[in-house]
């Protein structure tokens, strides 16, 4: 393995495993915080966040980790049947991640623009039910769209030239799994529809939703300031709304930036395959994992409860590690005192 490849593999591995650890930590902390609440229910925004982290976690474990392993030189091949299953899962989880990110942004925008806030257990229950229905539709609709992977996926061994790339799965043959359509026209139609429905449309809607969120956030802050709230309560409420808006906008901006690079690379490959195709695919290779790796960090740093809870967990782990390191020193010191006493 060359030195450059080793550096690339190390950087890519850091992205992969930081994404896995980050998503697991966010999911754990969200459920842990829910257990401390009186209602013991996940808030709607945290429910969407858990689904986003779950989709990212599944994508990292079942797709990005095999990519990292293949970068290290270990080749693993699946049978044709398992290739169809894995291709279905890759397309499904990738598309779910796109649409759940949009759902998180849209939920915050709708919350800011809403005139009447649902109060009481019945109102909160109704809002949670609506969120679960939307998430169920997202998972089910994307599963239906991913079903062609069960038909048009095949298995190859050794070096293979990819004639067509479908952006929702991977930018290269992985585990020996590639797309195989009866004609190039059919494959191009599926790749184009996948690009339009699962990439371009969510990206455009995210940008529009972010702009609407900025407008609604400004209007909401002006409305709160015009009300009769006290100074401390007003500052706390405005600060909370701003932080929530900044977190979601940073998350969407990270998503848009990473996914635009991958969309551009795969589109260039399918249409041109010029001299820059290999370099662009390398950029796409990293950008696809950049969002998965850094999105938990963005969420953890911007979400007040998550930030405090994760900080407490990290401090507890550091304290336990320090105690573990201090114990051998204490034992050695006690043994030394015992030996000195015996000599006397």
From Swiss-Prot:
Tissue occurrence: Highly expressed in the olfactory rosette. Specifically localizes to crypt neurons in the olfactory neuroepithelium. Colocalizes with the inhibitory G-protein gnaia in crypt neurons. Not detected in other tissues tested.
Topology with respect to the bilayer: Multi-pass membrane protein
**Superkingdom of source:** Eukaryota
- Annotated region (Disordered) at 324-344
Q: Where is the composition biased (Basic and acidic residues)?
A: 324-337
Entry's localization field: Cell membrane
What ranges are annotated Cytoplasmic (topological domains)? 32-47, 106-130, 208-246, 301-344
**Which sequence ranges are listed under topological domain Extracellular?**
1-10, 69-84, 152-186, 268-279
Single Gene Ontology BP term? sensory perception of smell
Concerning its family, UniProt says: Belongs to the G-protein coupled receptor 1 family.
Function noted in UniProt: Probable olfactory receptor.
Tell me what this protein is called: Olfactory receptor class A-like protein 4
């Amino acid at each position: 393995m060359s030195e450059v490849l080793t550096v690339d593999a190390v950087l890519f591995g850091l992205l992969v495993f930081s994404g896995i650890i980050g998503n697991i930590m966010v999911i754990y902390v969200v459920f842990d915080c829910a257990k401390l609440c009186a209602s013991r229910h996940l808030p709607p925004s945290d429910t969407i966040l858990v689904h986003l982290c779950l989709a990212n976690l599944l994508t990292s474990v079942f797709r990005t980790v095999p990519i990292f392993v293949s970068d290290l030189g270990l080749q693993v091949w699946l049978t044709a049947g398992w290739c169809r299953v894995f291709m279905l899962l890759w397309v499904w989880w990738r598309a779910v991640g796109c649409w759940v990110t949009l759902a998180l942004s849209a939920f915050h925008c709708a919350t800011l623009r809403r005139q009447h806030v649902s109060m009481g257990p019945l109102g909160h229950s109704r809002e949670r039910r609506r969120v679960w229905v939307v998430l169920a539709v997202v998972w089910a609709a994307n599963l239906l769209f991913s079903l062609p992977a069960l038909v048009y996926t095949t298995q190859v061994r050794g070096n293979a030239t990819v004639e067509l790339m479908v952006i929702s799965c991977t930018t290269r043959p992985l585990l020996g799994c590639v797309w195989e359509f009866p004609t190039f026209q059919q494959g191009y139609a599926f790749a184009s529809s996948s690009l339009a429905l699962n990439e371009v449309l969510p990206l455009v809607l995210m940008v529009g939703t972010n702009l609407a969120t900025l407008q609604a956030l400004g209007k909401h802050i002006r409305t709160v300031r015009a009300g009769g709230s006290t100074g401390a309560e007003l500052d706390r409420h405005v600060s909370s709304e701003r932080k929530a808006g900044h977190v979601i906008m940073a998350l969407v901006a990270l998503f848009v930036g990473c996914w635009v690079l991958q969309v551009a690379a795969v589109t260039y490959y399918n249409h041109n395959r010029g001299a820059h195709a290999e370099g662009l695919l390398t950029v796409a290779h990293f950008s696809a994992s950049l969002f998965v790796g850094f999105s938990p960090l963005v969420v953890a740093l911007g979400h007040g409860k998550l930030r405090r809870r994760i900080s407490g967990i990290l401090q507890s782990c550091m304290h336990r590690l320090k105690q573990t390191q201090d114990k051998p020193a204490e034992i050695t010191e006690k043994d030394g005192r015992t030996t000195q006493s015996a000599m006397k």
